[in-house]
């Protein structure tokens, strides 16, 4: 079964509405074309480190454009995004990544010290992707995110292709025990998406129909909670799938004033 998959959905949006906003954080705005192209750069890096179909790619990030870009990169080359709670300490991370066994991890510079500790306990990780947040330089064992996100020359697709059976792995927070990964088929996630725009996602994929339905930029949503939570990630995917945009706060702790200012904008 082919089924719907997010990479082709988002590529369809980027082709139809290339200049529509896709992400915004503070003064940073990313168009649908740039969102797609930057994800291609990350996807190319993933292929370069030797990933195979349905390898896991962990997002150890605060909210920001890089989170959704890296998720899209995973989908493009048939990998499984893995949400990672940025509040975890080294032991909790070692457990989570020991369970998920990611082939690659993308992380904010703020977490360098913690990652340094965990690296020795996660030898299966082939590549570490560093997102500069002004807190520390990129370590020699990692690759700078900006250096790969801006280098794509074409759309990325792995030899094994894409289909709706490929997964998204959502881990619980572990509040009632150890974190557990919930395996979602992409086609099932699409079927459960709330309708946030003009197109109705039918049982059988119809990417041409999606393109015809998109005539203008869609609605905007504000991901006020962390993208590492299913609420924010799944809502964001639903909005982006209809040509909409996702805004995130610049602060790393909840700021009601910034949130309301963003709502007004």
Language model regions located:
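Conserved pre-ATP/AMP-binding loop-to-beta segment of ANL
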Residues: 19, 152-171, 177-178, 183, ...
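Structural core segment of the AMP-binding/adenylate-forming
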Residues: 48-49, 76-150
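Conserved S/T- and glycine-rich ATP-binding loop of Class I adenylate-forming
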Residues: 57, 74, 105, 166, ...
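Flexible, low-complexity linker/hinge segments
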Residues: 1-4, 136-166
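A short helix-loop-beta submotif of the ANL/AMP-binding
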Residues: 56, 62-82, 86-90, 98-104, ...
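Conserved AMP-binding/adenylation subdomain of ANL enzymes
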Residues: 193-221, 228-265
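Conserved AMP-binding A3 loop
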Residues: 31-33, 167-195, 199
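Conserved AMP-binding/adenylate-forming core of the ANL superfamily
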Residues: 2, 21-64, 68-72, 89-94, ...
């Amino acid at each position: 079964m082919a089924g719907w998959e997010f990479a082709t959905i988002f590529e369809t949006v980027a082709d139809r509405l290339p200049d529509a906003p896709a992400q915004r954080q503070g003064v940073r705005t990313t168009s649908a074309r740039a969102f797609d192209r930057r994800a291609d750069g990350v996807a190319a890096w993933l292929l370069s480190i030797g990933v195979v179909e349905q390898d896991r790619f962990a997002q150890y990030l605060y909210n920001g454009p890089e989170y959704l870009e890296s998720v899209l990169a995973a989908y493009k080359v048939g990998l499984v995004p893995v949400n990672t709670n940025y509040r975890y300490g080294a032991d909790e991370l070692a457990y989570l990544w020991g369970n998920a066994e990611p082939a690659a991890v993308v992380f904010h510079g703020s977490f360098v010290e913690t990652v340094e500790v965990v690296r020795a306990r996660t030898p299966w990780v082939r590549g570490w992707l560093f997102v500069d947040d002004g807190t520390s330089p990129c370590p020699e064992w990692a690759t700078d995110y900006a250096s790969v996100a801006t280098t794509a020359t074409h759309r990325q697709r792995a030899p094994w292709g894409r289909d709706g059976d490929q997964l998204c792995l959502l881990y619980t927070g572990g509040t009632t025990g150890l974190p557990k990964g919930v395996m979602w088929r992409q086609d099932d996630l699409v079927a459960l998406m709330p309708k946030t725009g003009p197109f109705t996602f039918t049982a059988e994929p119809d990417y041409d129909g999606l393109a015809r339905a998109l005539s203008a930029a869609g609605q905007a949503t504000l991901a006020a909670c962390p993208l590492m939570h299913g609420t924010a990630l799944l809502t964001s995917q639903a909005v982006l799938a209809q040509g909409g945009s996702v805004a995130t706060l610049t602060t790393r702790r909840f700021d009601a004033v910034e949130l309301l200012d963003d709502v007004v904008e």
